[in-house]
Amino acid sequence: MKAPAFWYAPPGTARPLLSALLTPAALAWTAATRRRLSGTRPWHAPVPVICVGNLVAGGAGKTPVVLDLLSRLRRGGLDAHALSRGHGGRLPGPLRVDPARHTAAEVGDEPLLLAAAAPAWIARDRAAGARAAADAGAGVLVLDDGFQNPGIAKDLSLLVVDGDAGFGNGRVIPAGPLREPVADGLARAQAVLLLGEDRRGTADLCRGRLPVLRGRLVPDPQAAADLEGRRVLAFAGIGRPEKLFRTLEALGADVVARLPFPDHHPFTAAELRALLDRAAALDALPVTTQKDLVRLPAELRGQVRALPVSIAWEEPDTLDRLLAPLLSGKDDHGQAQ
């Protein structure tokens, strides 16, 4: 689903009127969410659980953060596993993702990316997935999303916020992009990670309530160098496709076509062939995101370039202090105690 423009429209424009008309529905959504969160007794996993979540519908940059945390924890001696719902995949789980065997249509796109870096599991039932991962030897679990899922207790919840988008118009679905009121979410989290320039005053809103970590998404240097000056046809089916388009322009690429698709869009062979034909007609290189790449038909995937990104932390020491209690209690088998 594409986010309605009024979700991120500034005050004083005509579009917020539609948001106001949807306020009763937003109040009903909020009440239902609060009942669901308060009415469920969470299951406590036998290993620490770190949740990387957000408060808005759509993309915020969680997957690169999960990948970074998995790497940090594993470097610290913990057998860190990823756990995802497997959004967009048809298999309910719990099961461990095998990139050589599973497809995005089966397990979702994010789990395939995570499985390339660490053991990754999918499960519609997060508690069942956590049990399976712990039984398989996981020393700590990193949840990709799941902040609003009350079925499993979290030891550390990190809310990721896109600095460009912030919390949008500050209203709850369908009047705005929020999955729950900001105050409710901040009350259950331990820290906020603000990605990119703070264009919406998010840091001021969170200051005094939670630590605010800062970071930015950085393209792979070699990939960036290869794209400088190249004619590019850019396409993406992520929460905010325009982020890819702006990044490519900032790298010096000549973006001659920008093609947004719905989040988690399952590209068909016919669609991709049409994109490749259009790129050829424009004498352009087809470029997409890593998340989109794993959803492309395997037989045509090699004709598309992906732009890998990673997170650069402004104050990694603050993150290390948040993770320290998990790292300090590990046993000889990488289990956190």
Swiss-Prot record:
Q: In its keyword annotation, does this UniProt entry include Nucleotide-binding?
A: yes
Mind telling me which Pfam families this protein's record contains?
LpxK (PF02606)
Q: In which pathway does it act?
A: Glycolipid biosynthesis; lipid IV(A) biosynthesis; lipid IV(A) from (3R)-3-hydroxytetradecanoyl-[acyl-carrier-protein] and UDP-N-acetyl-alpha-D-glucosamine: step 6/6
- What keywords are annotated for this sequence in UniProt? ATP-binding, Kinase, Lipid A biosynthesis, Lipid biosynthesis, Lipid metabolism, Nucleotide-binding, Transferase
Catalyzed reactions: a lipid A disaccharide + ATP = a lipid IVA + ADP + H(+)
Q: Which terms in the GO cellular component ontology are assigned?
A: plasma membrane
Gene Ontology BP terms: lipid A biosynthetic process; lipopolysaccharide core region biosynthetic process
An example molecular function term from Gene Ontology annotations: tetraacyldisaccharide 4'-kinase activity
Tree of life domain: Bacteria
The record's annotation in PANTHER family points to: TETRAACYLDISACCHARIDE 4'-KINASE (PTHR42724), TETRAACYLDISACCHARIDE 4'-KINASE, MITOCHONDRIAL-RELATED (PTHR42724:SF1)
Role according to the record: Transfers the gamma-phosphate of ATP to the 4'-position of a tetraacyldisaccharide 1-phosphate intermediate (termed DS-1-P) to form tetraacyldisaccharide 1,4'-bis-phosphate (lipid IVA).
Q: Its family?
A: Belongs to the LpxK family.
Q: What is this protein called?
A: Tetraacyldisaccharide 4'-kinase
Q: Which organism is it from?
A: Rhodospirillum centenum (strain ATCC 51521 / SW)
Encoding gene (name): lpxK
